[in-house]
Amino acid sequence: MSTSEILNLNPQGVWKYFHELNQIPRPTGQMEEVTKFVMDFGKSLNLETRQDKTGNVLIKKPASKGYESGKTIIIQSHLDMVPQKNADVIHDFSRDPI
């Protein structure tokens, strides 16, 4: 899928960040750049953003007005990727975006 096709998917804001994230090589053990990307993302939205001792990134968003007594939602994800490719494909996951 081309960049323009990705950026024209809806909702466009989600796919914009998906595309930016996929420009960052991030095999296991090489997560500095993707960690910075996610930390900067949280901070750019003025959200409480921190990294714990083990390297996890935590972003906290307060409840929307009127929903303060609602249940808490947690979204969890890995920042790294386990690279896989066919033997005949030339791709360096430590430096090439996907």
Predicted regions and their residues:
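N-terminal hydrophobic or amphipathic helices/low-complexity stretches enriched
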Residues: 1-24
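Intrinsically disordered, low-complexity boundary segments flanking structured domains
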Residues: 8, 45, 86-88
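Structural signal for hydrophobic packing residues in well-ordered secondary-structure cores
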Residues: 19-22, 42, 46, 83
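A non-catalytic alpha/beta surface segment that caps or lines the substrate-entry region
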Residues: 27-74
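Active-site metal-coordination/substrate-binding segment of hydrolases
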Residues: 68-98
